[in-house]
């Protein structure tokens, strides 16, 4: 009798623990699938549709279903960094040792931290890089501002130094 009570008690404890664990898990604990955009560049003269940026290039949104593991901004940025150029769409988010280091999202502000360097070949690359990064970050309703840093400085400071090399 005592042995069967112990077995019953043990089974009850295990089941209760399992139920508490399952009930306490939030939906956000598991990755969810979502459609995100990342932006590629169509050069001046293209017939593709999108937002016109400096040097009369066009930012073209590319939609993709992805798993959101941390936050949607980071997932979209990962897609942008992984995207390969084609004959009609170019990805200017490339360069020696360039990688996405960290993305935080708090109170409507997305902070994106990059390390490495961009491969900038002319003055038109500056608005291309800015456009691709900021449009990819700001597409989400819970992001009202995007702040991008590269090698511990603002993207604007980094790109203004690069731009000076072409003047």
Ranges and model annotations:
Residues 2-11, 18-167:
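Bimodal "functional hotspot" detector
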């Amino acid at each position: 009798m005592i042995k069967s009570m112990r077995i019953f008690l043990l089974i009850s404890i295990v089941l209760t623990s399992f139920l508490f664990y399952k009930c306490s898990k939030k939906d956000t604990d598991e990755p969810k699938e979502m459609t995100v955009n990342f932006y590629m560049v169509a050069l001046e003269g293209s017939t593709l549709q999108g937002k016109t940026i400096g040097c009369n290039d066009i930012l073209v949104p590319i939609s993709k279903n992805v798993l959101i593991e941390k936050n949607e901004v980071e997932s979209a940025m990962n897609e942008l960094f992984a995207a390969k150029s084609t004959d009609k769409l170019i990805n200017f988010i490339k360069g020696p040792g360039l990688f996405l280091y960290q993305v935080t999202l708090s109170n409507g502000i997305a902070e994106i931290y990059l390390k490495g360097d961009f491969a900038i070949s002319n003055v038109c690359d500056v608005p291309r890089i800015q456009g691709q990064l900021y449009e990819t970050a700001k597409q989400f309703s819970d992001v009202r501002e995007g702040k991008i840093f590269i090698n511990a400085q603002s993207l604007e400071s980094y790109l203004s130094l690069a731009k000076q090399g072409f003047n």
